[in-house]
């Protein structure tokens, strides 16, 4: 019934595209969980329990009592009502429930493919890497949450950046597999790989800085553009602070670096456009990337000026997926 190569490719494409979409949704929910300060509302991992939300007042009181023990409640949300707690609880609950579903949706089809298509021509075990990374992401998610349960009012921005970066890496890996299955035609004349990798490193750096900024609530200060409240450099720090050990813990410096990296990235993307013109490639690929970058910059500015309005901030985070996907299309076209 199932065992032929054409069926395998058809099911594989459907699975990868659906999985990609689910993880995009999970990133969106995770971002909203962060933006609504909901991530610490469930104080235990509950890997195999907690599938159902609290069903009665006693269960709600249990979760609320546990939340009252952590610094975030004592120092920030003291006096919060149970109804207010339910709002932040459901954001974190939705994120965890979706994560469980993604884990199952990754493993079950993989087992199905192994059972029915292992002897077909195009079968590969490489897709199990996705499941491994999804499991790793679950551990890192709890590692992140645990950093805000004992001494800190919030999660570590370093661990937050790891959590977001791994989610985006998983998406890029899945997207690469999708391109590979569709056998997208490659460029005949290659762009220098070192230059493309340099731009990729800048994009990754910008995403990490964005995660730092979010974790430090650094978007709530210097809400002006292109200046930083009337100056080029934040006025509450000095240039000497750029070489101190507290460099990545200072929200003012992180915002300055996030802005500066965006300008630097834009400069090298202009160079990339000139290379495209010179080599006379199909311009639609770089145009797609250009639009993604410009849209992301626009969203970043609007998010900043608005004082991190949730809708703009959420779209700005999702914009990083569009930027990475459009750039990985260029990387794939340029690969051997």
Curated annotation (Swiss-Prot):
Gene name of the record: ctaA
InterPro entries found in the cross-reference section: COX15/CtaA_fam, HemeA_Synthase_type2
Location of this chain's protein in the cell: Cell membrane
EC numbers for this chain: 1.17.99.9
Reactions the enzyme catalyzes: Fe(II)-heme o + 2 A + H2O = Fe(II)-heme a + 2 AH2
Family per similarity comment: Belongs to the COX15/CtaA family. Type 2 subfamily.
Pathway listed: Porphyrin-containing compound metabolism; heme A biosynthesis; heme A from heme O: step 1/1
Top-level taxonomic group: Bacteria
Entry binding sites for heme: 258, 316
Topology class, membrane: Multi-pass membrane protein
Transmembrane region(s): 12-32, 97-117, 130-150, 161-181, 194-214, 256-276, 285-305, 310-330
Any Pfam family: COX15-CtaA
Subunit structure: Interacts with CtaB.
Enzymatic class: oxidoreductase
Organism: Pelagibacter ubique (strain HTCC1062)
One of the record's GO molecular function terms: oxidoreductase activity, acting on NAD(P)H, heme protein as acceptor
GO cellular component, one term: plasma membrane
Protein name, UniProt field: Heme A synthase
The protein's role, per its UniProt record: Catalyzes the conversion of heme O to heme A by two successive hydroxylations of the methyl group at C8. The first hydroxylation forms heme I, the second hydroxylation results in an unstable dihydroxymethyl group, which spontaneously dehydrates, resulting in the formyl group of heme A.
């Amino acid at each position: 019934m199932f065992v032929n190569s054409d069926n395998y490719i058809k099911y594989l494409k459907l699975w990868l595209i659906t999985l990609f979409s689910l993880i995009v949704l999970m990133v969106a929910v995770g971002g909203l969980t962060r933006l609504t300060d909901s991530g610490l509302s469930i104080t235990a991992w509950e890997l195999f329990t907690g599938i159902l939300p609290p069903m009665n007042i006693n269960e709600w009181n249990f979760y609320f009592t546990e939340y009252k023990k952590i610094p975030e409640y004592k120092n920030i949300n003291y006096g919060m009502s149970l109804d207010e707690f339910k709002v932040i609880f459901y954001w974190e609950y939705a994120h965890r429930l979706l994560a469980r579903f993604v884990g199952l949706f990754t493993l079950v089809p993989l087992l199905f493919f192994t059972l029915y298509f292992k002897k077909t021509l195009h079968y590969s075990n490489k897709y199990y890497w996705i499941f491994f990374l999804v499991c790793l992401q679950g551990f890192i998610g709890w590692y992140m949450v645990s950093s805000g349960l004992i001494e800190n009012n919030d999660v570590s921005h370093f661990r937050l950046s790891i959590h977001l970066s791994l989610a985006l890496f998983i998406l890029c890996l899945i997207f690469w597999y999708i391109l590979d299955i569709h056998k997208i035609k490659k460029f005949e004349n290659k762009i220098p790989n070192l230059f493309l990798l340099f731009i990729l490193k800048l994009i990754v750096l910008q995403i990490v800085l964005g995660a730092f900024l979010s974790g430090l609530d650094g978007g709530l200060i210097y809400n002006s553009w292109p200046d930083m409240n009337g100056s080029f450099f934040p006025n509450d720090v000095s240039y000497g602070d750029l070489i101190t050990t507290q460099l990545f813990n200072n929200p003012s410096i992180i915002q300055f670096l996030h802005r500066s990296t965006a300008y630097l990235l834009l400069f090298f993307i202009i160079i990339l456009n000139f290379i495209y013109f010179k080599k006379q490639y199909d311009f639609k690929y770089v145009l797609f990337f250009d639009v993604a970058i410009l849209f992301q910059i626009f969203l970043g500015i609007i998010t900043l000026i608005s004082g991190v309005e949730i809708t703009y901030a959420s779209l700005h985070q999702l914009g990083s997926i569009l930027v990475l996907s459009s750039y990985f299309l260029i990387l794939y076209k340029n690969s051997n």
